[in-house]
Amino acid sequence: MMKSLFLFSAHPKPPPLPPSPHLRKLLRLTASASTSASSPPRAGCSRGPAHARPRPSPRPSPSSSLYARPSLLDMERGRAARRADVDAFLASLGVDPGELAGLELPATVDVMRERVEFLHSLDLSNEDLAAYPLALGCSVRKNMVPVLDYLGKLGVRQDALPDLLRRYPQVLHASVVVDLAPVVKYLQGMDVRPHDVPRVLERYPELLGFKLEGTMSTSIAYLVGIGVARRQVGSVITRFPEVLGMRVGKIIKPFVEHLEGIGLQRLAIARIIEKKPYVLGFGLEDKVKPNIEALLEFGVRKEALAFIVAQYPDILGIELRDKLATQQSLFESSILVSSEDFGRVIERMPQAISLGRTAVLKHVNFLTSCGFLLSQVSKMVVACPQLLALNMDIMKMSFEYFQNEMERDLEELVEFPAFFTYGLESTVRPRHEMVAKKGFTCSLAWLLNCSDAKFDERMKYDTIGIEEMEVDNSFDTNTLSERVEDEVEDEDLDEDSDYDSTDDEFIE
């Protein structure tokens, strides 16, 4: 067996047969195709197949894709065209598109038209939009609806909303949480009652744009500092919210200091502000100072200015000079009051400047019909100008009682015309009956010109001493002025009011 293996391995391996001519040609073609597929030659290159680079595939024509993407330039041109359409639409409304340059607006005219129609539904006209075109940059759903919904929940009236938006359209840009709610919370913290908050915002919507740490806080702090009671702050803000926007150094402090200069104490000024806070809105240079000068020109003494302002603060804000000239002419012609005495009339009752001609003549005619001479009427009016503002029916009843029950001489009324200012049933009748019962004979001044406590003390006397009889016929003009002012306020809507409503002056 070993011999057989040796014999098998000893024979050499036969050489391969040479390929036939046909097979050699086929092998060459196959090798050439394989080489060309693996590394195609680059055009223009003289190198062999191993160094050739692939050709770039040709760009497909637009017709070869169903979703051809526009270029950035095409997109920008489209946006510009749509913005031009929106601008043209705004221009047709009278809005200057240039005012909105750089502001992002709705992409289409249809969306912008929807926004304009919403603003029109709030009773805002095209003129309003032209006055504040930035309102057109507010989204209806993101900006306007939340703000309007919040104002409505506060209690802002629907009919007051258009005026609020015209005066402060910036509210449409506001954030309810960041801008509006803190202001409302501040007002409530100043004791403005919840149902008064919407009235405050309706009257002074600019308040919604104030910062809490700014003018609002400083103005209130100053008022409290001069004596305005803390519990009255809410009432002051409710009746005159504009005070929250007044700068202390430029408006409030100069106003207070000027009133101090004419003799008013700070505490008296604080009481005026508590009662009539709108006086802070009277311009110092164009109203207050000229009116003070006018009073002096028409015979009012400088030392009486403080009393006049305290009794009738509105005198600081009306068109006073022409009013004084008209009233002085009326008093001179109808009551024979001299120019000097006219100043005394204003000092004792500053409200006399608002008396209508009809009211004056009606009271003068009544007094002359009672038997007084015009010269006596003049004296009575100068001493007690309140006669010209009292209720006519009450005056008639008082005079009838004086003439029929008291049976006194008319000269006593000339000396003490304030008799007509006392209540018949509350004061005159009971005091007269007590004096008559005691058998006293006294003047009208002794009878009436004292407090109830003082009168009760007098009724303990057995006789009236000489010093008691020499009672001053003067009376408290401060009390009378307050009484007359209250009557005038009660009778403002009465057709028989002694004040001519057509001649009354109110803050503008």
Swiss-Prot record:
Presequence range in chain numbering: 1-79
Segments of skewed composition (Low complexity): 28-49
Annotated compartments: Plastid, Chloroplast stroma
Region Disordered: start-end pairs: 28-69, 475-508
Keywords per UniProt: Chloroplast, Plastid, Transcription, Transcription regulation, Transcription termination, Transit peptide
GO cellular component: chloroplast stroma
Similarity comment text for this entry: Belongs to the mTERF family.
Record function comment: Transcription termination factor required for processing and steady-state levels of plastid transcripts. Required for splicing of the chloroplastic group II intron. Required for the accumulation of 16S and 23S ribosomes.
Protein name as it appears in the record: Transcription termination factor MTERF4, chloroplastic
Organism: Oryza sativa subsp. japonica
